[in-house]
Structures are given as structure tokens and as C-alpha cells.
């Protein structure tokens, strides 16, 4: 595998940092996940999302933690920190989302250990960045990414309340960015032997994702947009005859208008100077949306899909998460896969969104139980059985 021989130590919880470490594990790195004695907090969150959350079936934990070894260590104890240091001494990459103040209390913040481990890549998820008035504020996907980052406001219908957003969306993009940054630093290490501090914040990830809208806002482009008054009538959503919705994305208005008008049988639009070029259209958007909307109600989504595909015009049907579970395109490309849990039930999980043609997909190793590999890992660090048992008795470790 691509990252065979790379060692990753993960001290994190929930989604953003764990999914980064999982990607590295998916690509062949050895990942050791450190959980507290009680386990990662996401292990008990399934019920909030109507999902199983038992030791025998826990898809929310599984999604972020497959292809890892799991150890359970009390890193607030002196002995636990000692074990952590031994792990870091052998690691190429350290992935964490623990806040800087907490890392400082343990003596493992970047500035405290960079000289001790000069080749270590210290990769950290932050809420709001390293500086500024919010640098110490806890950041979550819902807050730092969606709310403060402007994403919630961008997906609401104008004049309505902010959207109740999809959990984990921003976390996964932040994790993907951290994985990319970590690998760039790993390349530098291969050349120089020197480590690096890599940070990705949820807030910055949102700002980057919203970059087009943020940069155009200074020139008068406003968000949120109403679907009835978008930037272009050919770049919005429409309801079809069967009640399903379609997204048009005809971003080159002048180029595609003629072909589209023929598809919807409204060629008279091309003779109307209010609509037949982009310069005049921008002053009559709502009127043209009504015309197109009436046309789209004449056929079902499947009927429009066939006609638009034949015309080679960009569009897509709007799907739900339930639809995606059965999406033939997703299954054909191995974007999804099935896992049988210890409970005997089979569920669908999502693969990391990067494919390597020659390497293929690594054979999946299920996410660990709490402390499943504690003994194995401690022995590899030189601890004998008696010492490990003493650690367990004093609640330094769990297995």
C-alpha cells in the first residue's frame, strides 16, 4: 500500500481528526488510536441519529475508525503520558483534535515536544485557528464550520430560518484537508528528516469552501439566494410533475439557452430580448424562473432526465440520503461498501473519497473495541505482562 511503513498515532475524538487518521490507515499507514478509558465520545452518539451504538454494531464509530488499532490509555495520568511519549517516539505523524491548553497540561503541545521529536509531523484540527480571540474556543462542525463559517446561511431559502445542517459534513472536509497537509509534510520529512506542525481549522475550511461567495460578496453578490430569484434561471432547482426536484447547472447561459429552450419546448424565449442574452436576463430573472418552472411541471423527473441527457445539458436529480443507499453509480465505483457487524446485521458504510487505480482499496479491518489492542501495543513498546496488568489495575489502561 502507498503508506506502508508510515506510523500514525491518533489522540482524538468524534469525527474531524479521526477521519483524517482513518484516511491514512486506508492508504496503508499503521494507525494507533488512543481512546480514554471510557472510550471515544462518538461511541455513544448513535442514538441521537437513530443508529445502533453497541459494541457489536456501531456504524457512527465504524465510519471514522476502521483500519486502526485501538488502545485505551488515561493520558491524564503520569504513566499514561509516559506511554504516549513512547508511542510518539516511534511515530511519523501525530493526529489530534485535543485543544492546545489540554495538550499543554499533559506536556505534549507542539512547542513542548518539537525538539524532543524533531522528525514528528504534528497534525492538529482546531476550531477557529491558532490566533485571535476565539483560538481557545471549542469548535464543532455545527458551530465553527456551518454557523460562523457562513455555510448554514448559504443553504437556507431566502427569508426562512437557517438550515438544520448535515452532521459531520464540515468535519470530513477538515479531515481531508489535514490528511493532505500531513502527507505534504511527510514528503518534506522524507527529503530533510524534519517534522512540521500542520493545522486545519473548521472555520477556515468553511471560509475556503465558501470562497467564491465570500469574494463576490464584496461586489454585491448576496447570499442566501432564493430559488425563485437566483443568479440565473438556468442555475436553480425546479419541481417536476411527479413532485421530485431537479437541479439545473447551465452555467454558460448564452451558450446553452437555445438548446435548453428546445428541450422544454419554449423556443419563443429566444425571440424575447428580455431573456435571450445574459446581459438583459439578469434584470428579469424571476419572470424567466416562472416560465421555466411551469414548463418543468409538465414532465416527471425521469422524463426530464432522459431529455436533458440526450441534449448533453448539465443537470442532476436531487437525492436524499435514503436514495444514495441504493445509488447504482455509487455502488459501481465502490463509493459505498457493506459490512457485517458482530451483531450479525449488515450495514452500508462510505469509502474514503480518493481512489488509486493500481493500489485498489485496502482490505477493510473493522474498527477496534475499546482497548482491543492495548496489550499488543504495550508489549511492542517493551512493557512486560506484569507491568501491563499493574497499569490496568491502577486504571492507567483498559483492555
From Swiss-Prot:
Reactions catalysed, as given in the entry: 4-methylpentanoyl-CoA + (2R)-hydroxy-4-methylpentanoate = (R)-2-hydroxy-4-methylpentanoyl-CoA + 4-methylpentanoate
Keywords: Transferase
Biochemical pathway: Amino-acid degradation; L-leucine degradation
E.C. no: 2.8.3.24
Catalytic residues of the enzyme: 171
Molecular function terms, GO-annotated: transferase activity
Gene3D superfamilies per record: Crotonobetainyl-coa:carnitine coa-transferase, domain 1 (3.40.50.10540), formyl-coa transferase, domain 3 (3.30.1540.10)
Keyword Transferase: yes
Complexes and interactors: Homodimer.
Biological function: Involved in the reductive branch of L-leucine fermentation. Catalyzes the transfer of the CoA moiety from 4-methylpentanoyl-CoA (isocaproyl-CoA) to (R)-2-hydroxy-4-methylpentanoate ((R)-2-hydroxyisocaproate), leading to the formation of (R)-2-hydroxy-4-methylpentanoyl-CoA. Other CoA thioesters, such as acetyl-CoA or butyryl-CoA, are not accepted as substrates.
Family: Belongs to the CoA-transferase III family.
Name recorded for this polypeptide: (R)-2-hydroxy-4-methylpentanoate CoA-transferase
Protein species of origin: Clostridioides difficile
Gene: hadA
Amino acid at each position: 500500500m502507498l503508506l506502508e511503513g508510515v506510523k500514525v498515532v491518533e489522540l482524538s475524538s468524534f469525527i474531524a481528526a479521526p477521519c483524517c487518521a482513518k484516511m491514512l490507515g486506508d492508504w496503508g499507514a499503521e494507525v494507533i488510536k488512543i481512546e480514554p478509558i471510557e472510550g471515544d465520545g462518538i461511541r455513544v452518539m448513535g442514538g441521537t441519529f437513530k443508529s445502533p451504538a453497541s459494541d457489536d454494531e456501531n456504524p457512527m464509530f465504524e465510519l471514522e475508525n476502521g483500519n486502526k488499532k485501538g488502545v485505551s490509555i488515561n493520558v491524564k495520568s503520569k504513566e499514561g503520558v509516559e506511554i504516549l511519549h513512547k508511542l510518539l517516539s516511534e511515530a511519523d505523524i501525530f493526529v489530534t483534535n485535543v485543544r492546545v491548553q489540554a495538550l499543554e497540561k499533559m506536556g505534549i503541545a507542539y512547542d513542548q515536544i518539537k525538539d524532543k521529536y524533531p522528525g514528528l509531523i504534528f497534525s492538529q484540527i482546531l476550531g477557529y485557528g491558532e490566533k485571535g480571540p476565539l483560538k481557545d474556543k471549542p469548535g464543532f462542525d455545527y458551530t465553527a464550520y456551518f454557523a460562523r463559517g457562513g455555510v448554514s446561511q448559504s443553504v437556507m431559502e431566502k427569508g426562512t430560518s437557517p438550515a438544520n445542517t448535515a452532521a459531520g459534513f464540515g468535519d470530513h472536509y477538515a479531515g481531508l484537508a489535514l490528511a493532505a497537509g500531513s502527507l505534504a509534510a511527510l514528503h518534506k520529512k522524507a527529503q530533510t528528516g524534519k517534522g512540521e506542525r500542520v493545522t486545519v481549522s473548521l472555520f477556515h475550511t468553511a471560509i475556503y469552501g465558501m470562497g467564491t461567495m465570500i469574494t463576490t460578496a464584496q461586489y454585491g453578490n448576496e447570499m442566501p439566494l432564493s430559488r425563485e430569484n437566483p443568479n440565473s434561471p438556468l442555475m436553480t432547482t425546479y419541481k417536476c410533475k411527479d413532485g421530485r426536484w431537479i437541479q439545473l447547472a447551465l452555467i454558460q447561459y448564452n451558450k446553452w439557452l437555445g438548446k435548453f429552450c428546445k428541450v422544454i419546448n419554449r423556443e419563443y424565449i429566444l425571440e424575447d430580448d428580455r431573456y435571450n442574452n445574459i446581459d438583459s436576463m439578469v434584470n428579469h430573472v424571476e419572470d424567466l424562473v416562472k416560465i421555466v418552472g411551469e414548463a418543468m411541471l409538465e414532465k416527471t423527473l425521469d422524463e426530464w432526465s432522459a431529455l436533458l441527457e440526450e441534449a448533453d445539458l448539465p443537470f442532476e436529480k436531487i437525492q436524499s440520503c435514503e436514495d444514495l443507499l441504493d445509488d447504482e453509480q455509487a455502488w459501481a465505483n465502490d463509493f459505498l461498501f457493506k459490512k457485517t457487524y458482530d451483531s450479525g446485521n449488515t450495514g452500508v458504510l462510505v469509502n474514503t473519497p480518493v481512489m488509486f487505480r493500481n493500489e485498489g482499496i485496502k482490505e477493510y479491518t473493522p474498527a477496534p473495541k475499546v482497548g482491543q489492542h492495548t496489550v499488543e501495543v504495550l508489549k511492542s513498546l517493551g512493557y512486560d505482562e506484569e507491568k501491563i496488568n499493574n497499569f490496568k489495575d491502577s486504571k492507567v489502561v483498559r483492555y
